[in-house]
């Protein structure tokens, strides 16, 4: 078993502590992603000898793209070669309005700034397009780009499946959604970092708290709780190009440092089968 337990889930487990303690103690070994999850299970009576922290296997499956392939992604998305790009990925209702307002204000200062906006649920794309139009911001839907040329847009609405990961590869930095409004929980904060990109996220990242804390500590992540904080963080990174270049190398080291969970879990399974 490999897993993580958020504070929200832990509160539920504690209500029925005796039941979950008995349930989890049936497992031979519980491989947890972080100490917080291990300590949570121990607090409801799970035997510590059955608990082992091995890290997050997501670090072992992160994609990579060569510079040549990244250039092709940029061309495919019709993003101008000299544009600065930020991505707001896996956004939820209530987040797009804030992000678009921040982008519109920053566009006045940074004329070559492009936002790629990727709602988490594709069925929200039509609603998101209406929000963009209501704000008078020039945009194009990714699904409409197949037969269009040119770079005349401020926002690219990513309304297609399976492209967000490679889009992260061509941005300067990213905001990861489901973190700015309640109940939140956060989505995968590590995906942009795999491409050397620092990340912004809101205060509601319970599902990824351990990774969020590690990113903040390393300087690769910034938590923003208000629209003003988001704008200030984006403006800072747009203005500090040398810092972004430094963070790119740091991000790759961060990922390498956290890899190996899958191998550790495989070794544990192998030992159990032999024993």
Where are these regions (language model features)?
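Nucleotide-activated sugar donor-binding and catalytic core shared by glycosyltransferases
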Residues: 1-275
């Amino acid at each position: 078993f490999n897993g993580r337990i958020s504070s929200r889930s832990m509160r539920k487990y504690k209500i029925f502590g005796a039941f979950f303690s008995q349930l989890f103690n049936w497992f031979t070994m519980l491989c947890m992603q972080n100490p917080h999850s291990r300590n949570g299970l121990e607090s409801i009576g799970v035997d510590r000898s059955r608990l082992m922290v091995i890290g997050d296997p997501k670090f072992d499956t992160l994609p990579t793209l060569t510079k040549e392939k990244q250039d092709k992604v940029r061309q495919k998305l019709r993003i101008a070669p000299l544009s600065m790009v930020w991505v707001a990925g896996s956004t939820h209702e209530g987040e797009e309005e804030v992000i678009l307002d921040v982008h519109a204000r920053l566009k006045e200062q940074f004329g070559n700034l492009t936002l790629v906006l990727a709602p988490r649920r594709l069925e929200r794309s039509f609603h998101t397009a209406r929000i963009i139009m209501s704000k008078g911001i020039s945009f194009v839907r990714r699904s409409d780009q197949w037969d269009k040329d040119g770079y005349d847009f401020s926002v690219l609405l990513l309304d297609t499946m399976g492209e967000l990961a490679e889009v992260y590869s061509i941005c300067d930095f990213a905001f990861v959604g489901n973190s700015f409004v309640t109940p939140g929980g956060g989505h995968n904060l590590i995906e942009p970092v795999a491409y050397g990109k620092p990340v912004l996220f809101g205060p509601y990242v319970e599902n990824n708290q351990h990774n969020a804390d590690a990113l903040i500590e390393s300087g690769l992540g910034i938590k923003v709780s208000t629209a003003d904080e988001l704008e200030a963080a984006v403006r800072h990174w747009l203005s500090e190009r040398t810092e972004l270049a430094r963070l790119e190398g740091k991000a790759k080291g961060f990922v390498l440092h956290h890899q190996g969970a899958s191998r550790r879990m495989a070794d544990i399974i192998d030992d159990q089968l032999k024993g």
